[in-house]
Amino acid sequence: MGLDPGDWQLQQLRSVSGLTGLERLTSATRAGAPLGRTVSEGPSKLSCVALTIGIVGLPNVGKSTLFNALTRATVLAANYPFATIEPNVGVVPLPDARLDKLAELFHSARVVPATVSFVDIAGIVRGASEGEGLGNQFLANIREADAICMVTRAFEDPDVVHVDGKVEPSGDIETISTELVLADMQTLEKAIPRLEKEVRGKKTEPVVLETAQAALKVLEEGTLLSAGAQAAGIDAEVLKTFQLMTTKPFIYVFNMDDAGMSDEARQAELRELVAPAEAIFLDAQFEAELVELEPEEAAEMLHDNGQEESGLDKLARVGFDTLGLQTYLTAGEKESRAWTIRKGATAPQAAGVIHTDFERGFIKAEIVSYDDLVQYGSVAEARAHGRVRMEGKDYVMADGDVVEFRFNV
């Protein structure tokens, strides 16, 4: 990243791990390299935070319509169960007005936002844990997701059949939650006898068996582990090793009609139903129409509908936060870009998201906060006012840090 031409150097990384045309991911000046000289690196691996949110829901709740809107993709959204057979993956940009401001300051040719990946997973019905419907395929696909977005129907439409014959959000949520709980119970019930033998043979630590038994007890009470594990005192790190579906964070999307979108009492009721998880209310059909418009027209349509932001933008933001992610920024004439890191990441770990060499040979990071940069208008002015700082290997990145990494390999 070159925040000021002449201050921070630019470089181009080419053909890294099969990725071609990857332009100037960041500026990086090797220790000892003359000022004004760019440094080119040989092939090595890129590191990235690639997390996905699985979109699940009973058939005909508007799940594929939502996915179509999220990705502007063409996904079959027919009015019959199992219209979605294979999981469809979409990468959705995370709205970030800071990038537009950086592009203005540095005359960037383009902006590259952070992204959230969504996977549209085939519909689930009662008995999925026993293989009913597309149960086995559903369970295999959802295990690969890092968080679960459960789409629930909260609108009435006689032309769109409901798989259970009635619209009842609490019932839909219970159906899907029950299938996930049952599937996780099966996983643990198979694992516990094996773990008991391994503990007796001193091949496995007792805490692993104890964690499995405690988790099974929570599930037997009909509670998702994401909601009940902490209260039960279950070791979170050990629990992760079982790769259970109900340990994943949940987001609940209620697909509503015009009446529902203006019914605050109904929304409060549904929000309480899924608390402490996040609840998002949107009209999937409206969102699908919105994404087909030019930005100015879309903004006007949102305003006329009494909304400050689209449901999709909110879903992307909530999804990003639910995954425990944040961004730092780079900027220059070629591009202004947001990079995705986990909350709590150190400066070397953040550098590794751009290129593994940056982490391996990390020396320091030159950082200015976005707010300070905008206030002073340039890196040079921010530096003159003492707002640009050098940080070392132990620095924990803050959201909105604008960064230049220095490294030596």
Please tell me what each predicted stretch does.
Residues 5, 20, 26-33, 38:
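Ala/Thr-enriched low-complexity intrinsically disordered regions
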Residues 44-132, 136-142, 148-152:
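Conserved G1/Walker A P-loop phosphate-binding module
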Residues 44-56, 61, 67, 194-398, ...:
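C-terminal-of-GTPase-core extension/linker across diverse P-loop GTPases
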Residues 11, 39, 45-46:
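Short, positively charged and aromatic/hydrophobic N-terminal segments
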Residues 123-129, 146-182, 202, 224-228, ...:
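Conserved Switch II/interswitch segment of TRAFAC-class P-loop GTPases
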Residues 117, 146-153, 172-180, 186-193, ...:
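Conserved beta-strand/loop subsegment of P-loop NTPase cores
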